[in-house]
Amino acid sequence: MQFISVSELKSRLDAGEKLNLIDVREPDEHQEFNIGGTLVPLGQILTMMTEEIDDLKDQEVICYCRSGKRSLQASLMLETIGFTRVLNLQGGMNAWQEQQG
């Protein structure tokens, strides 16, 4: 598992790159503020209920949460179940809002 910075992710989004973003927060957190992607709460990943993203196993996926802790857990679990190109957003949405406003 590797990390991606807020500035690198923002640059890639601004360039129009199609990214596979996975928000591992809870639905209410996602609804409050998100940067897109698929909502798959950490609990679903930990119980391997990942049907909505199973077709991404060989593609780059970028996990994010509020602070980077849940997405770190999710990233490690995704690697355990066969995902090969997992990135974790450093600092999560807290860092995003701090740096991007």
Specify the residue positions occupied by each region the protein language model found.
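Rhodanese-like catalytic fold shared by cysteine-dependent sulfurtransferases
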Residues: M1-N20, V24-I62, R66-G101
